[in-house]
């Protein structure tokens, strides 16, 4: 499976199921790559998979693709020392890969079960951008016969908030789309804030769509709970202390980074994500359980060991 086939397979996975997270599509692609690999050593297989992850990150530069790929590689590689026979070892690696994929496919439902209980009847919720996990949580709240209304930022520059508003309208949830600049104005009207995350970093902070940080700052200033919902495959080995510490490969789209290599100035581009400090986050709802920001590092160590 060469790089062109790898990229085409990845894109076809996303096209088949637009609701699928890009990280899940990447893991499915890596599993298919593992099945088709013709290498003869474990070391060579690991090197090929690492190269494949880098190729996928070049197509989709989101944090989740990077962390999901790395966790997948670690999870399937645990058996590599137990078997001396390569074919048997590869078979076990494929089986473990399928287990990993099944496990992460159930993540959103687990998170929804945990989080929707925090939504009280009559709640006014503020959210940001389009998050499939947040949508699943709100679907669970609707299924539990809870009445609530949602304010959502339009989320420039791609107006993904309007996509979220449309999805919520299908659930018959009252939705109001507000300007990104109106977050401070609307905050006094809401009871809680729920956002997704593109990545959860080692100190319990998050990397998410640009505008999340200002929402968290406003929520903290007005004593509103700020909840984050994210799957565990988004836990990434990164320890930013401020916005400048977030690597450019996560801040900008892959196409933008390629254009920079041809001489375009990155300072003229707008970042797509920002970093939100753990001190601004109330709780994180993950498929590993409900975590405080300080507990994230313990879980991250367990995942990556």
UniProtKB/Swiss-Prot annotation:
Transmembrane segments: none
Subcellular location as annotated: Cytoplasm, Cytosol
Keyword Amino-acid biosynthesis: no
GO biological process: cytoplasmic translational initiation; translational initiation
Record bears the keyword Protein biosynthesis: yes
Molecular-function GO term, any one: translation initiation factor activity
Activity regulation information from UniProt: Activated by the chemical integrated stress response (ISR) inhibitor ISRIB which stimulates guanine nucleotide exchange factor activity for both phosphorylated and unphosphorylated eIF2.
InterPro entries noted in UniProt: eIF2B_alpha/beta/delta (IPR051501), elF-2B_alpha_N (IPR042528), IF-2B-related (IPR000649), IF_2B-like_C (IPR042529), NagB/RpiA_transferase-like (IPR037171)
GO CC annotation: cytosol; eukaryotic translation initiation factor 2B complex
Pfam families to which the protein is assigned, alphabetical: IF-2B (PF01008)
Keyword annotations from UniProtKB, A to Z: Cytoplasm, Initiation factor, Protein biosynthesis
Family the UniProt entry places it in: Belongs to the eIF-2B alpha/beta/delta subunits family.
Subunit note: Component of the translation initiation factor 2B (eIF2B) complex which is a heterodecamer of two sets of five different subunits: alpha, beta, gamma, delta and epsilon. Subunits alpha, beta and delta comprise a regulatory subcomplex and subunits epsilon and gamma comprise a catalytic subcomplex. Within the complex, the hexameric regulatory complex resides at the center, with the two heterodimeric catalytic subcomplexes bound on opposite sides.
Function: Acts as a component of the translation initiation factor 2B (eIF2B) complex, which catalyzes the exchange of GDP for GTP on eukaryotic initiation factor 2 (eIF2) gamma subunit. Its guanine nucleotide exchange factor activity is repressed when bound to eIF2 complex phosphorylated on the alpha subunit, thereby limiting the amount of methionyl-initiator methionine tRNA available to the ribosome and consequently global translation is repressed.
Name of protein: Translation initiation factor eIF2B subunit alpha
Lineage per the UniProt record: Eukaryota, Metazoa, Chordata, Craniata, Vertebrata
């Amino acid at each position: 499976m060469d790089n062109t086939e790898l990229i085409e397979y990845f894109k076809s996975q996303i096209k088949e199921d637009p609701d699928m997270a890009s990280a899940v599509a990447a893991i499915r692609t890596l599993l298919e790559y593992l099945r088709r690999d013709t290498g003869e050593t474990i070391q060579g297989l690991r090197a090929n998979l690492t190269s494949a992850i880098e190729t996928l990150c070049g197509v989709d530069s989101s944090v989740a693709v990077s962390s999901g790929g790395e966790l997948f590689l670690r999870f399937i590689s645990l058996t590599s020392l137990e078997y001396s026979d390569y074919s048997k070892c590869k078979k076990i690696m494929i089986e473990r890969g399928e287990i990993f994929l099944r496990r992460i496919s159930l993540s959103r439902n687990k998170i929804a079960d945990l989080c929707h209980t925090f939504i009280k009847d009559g709640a006014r919720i503020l959210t940001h951008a389009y998050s499939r996990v947040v949508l699943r949580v709100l679907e669970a709240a609707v299924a539990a016969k809870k009445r609530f209304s949602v304010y959502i930022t339009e989320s420039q520059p791609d107006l993904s908030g309007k996509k979220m508003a449309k999805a919520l309208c299908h659930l018959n949830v009252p939705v109001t789309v507000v300007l990104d600049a109106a977050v401070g104005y609307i905050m006094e009207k809401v009871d809680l804030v729920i956002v997704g995350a593109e990545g959860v970093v080692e100190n319990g902070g998050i990397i998410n769509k640009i505008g999340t940080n200002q929402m968290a700052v406003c929520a903290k200033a007005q004593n509103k709970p700020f909840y984050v919902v994210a799957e565990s495959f988004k836990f990434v080995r990164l320890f930013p202390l401020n916005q400048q510490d977030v690597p450019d490969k996560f801040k900008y789209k892959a196409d933008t980074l390629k254009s920079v290599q041809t001489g375009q100035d990155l300072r003229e581009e707008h970042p797509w994500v920002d970093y939100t400090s753990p001190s601004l986050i109330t709780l994180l709802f993950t498929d590993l359980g409900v975590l405080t920001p300080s507990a994230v590092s313990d879980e991250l160590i367990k995942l990556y060991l």
